[in-house]
Amino acid sequence: MYFRTMANSADTLKSVERAFRILEFVRDNEPVSLTQVSEALDMSKSTIHRYLSTLVSVGYLGQEVDGYRVSFEFLSYANRIHLREPSYPATKRKVRELAETSEELVQFTTDEKGRLVYLFKETGRNGLVSRPDARTFRPLHSTAGGKAILSTWSDAEIEAYVDRNGLDAVTEHTITSLDVLFEELERVREHGYATNKEETVEGLGAVAVPIADQDNEVVGALGISGPINRVGNGEYVELLRDAKKELELNIRLL
């Protein structure tokens, strides 16, 4: 009886692991078909179908005409994290203030397993309407916020990031060389801010600064995005520097 229970426990853990692998693949590639998931994870279609059907039935995936997508159920978890993290209300207020002042798109981003995730965003009067939200991930090396975060890492940590994630090109302007990335991050450290010149989306520019907590640990990046002719060459740097000082002071006082 003992050995049977242990075997079942191991099988159950393996099943949970597979379910999360499927969820992560759908999240990163949605919408996806059953065949795409089966081929990507090297599992039979019948097995994948059972997993997908179960995840749909419990509300964590949605099945639409164009394929499977993650559901908004995950936003409830994100909201719980927001409530738990004391610095988030101050951060959200600062994002809103910056959007009003700059009249551009303002975003607060953070690093999640080597990818950039968008926590808060606010669109100013002239700002671009942005699709990225808490379900969207970007490579750190292709964004201003990501490079701002990377600039605070050691060389060994940056090399480990590249080993795990690579330096894939998102556009023809994306950095794809480790040497070039190191040079870029040195400039970010020297000037205190990072830029994105059409490295994620053609025609889009951005500038961002890293944000640290009371222990001087970087918790994310505050950035402004817009058309390359308005943002991307250091515009709004002073505005962001002032916002950084105020936000980090508020976080330290919590």
Report the location of each language-model feature.
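Short, basic/aromatic recognition patches
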Residues: A90-L98, V162-L204, D242, E246-N250
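Short hydrophobic beta-strand micro-motif common in sensory/regulatory domains
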Residues: G205-V209
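Juxtadomain coupling helices with adjacent low-complexity linkers
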Residues: E202, G220-L254
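Amphipathic alpha-helical effector-binding/dimerization core
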Residues: F72-N165
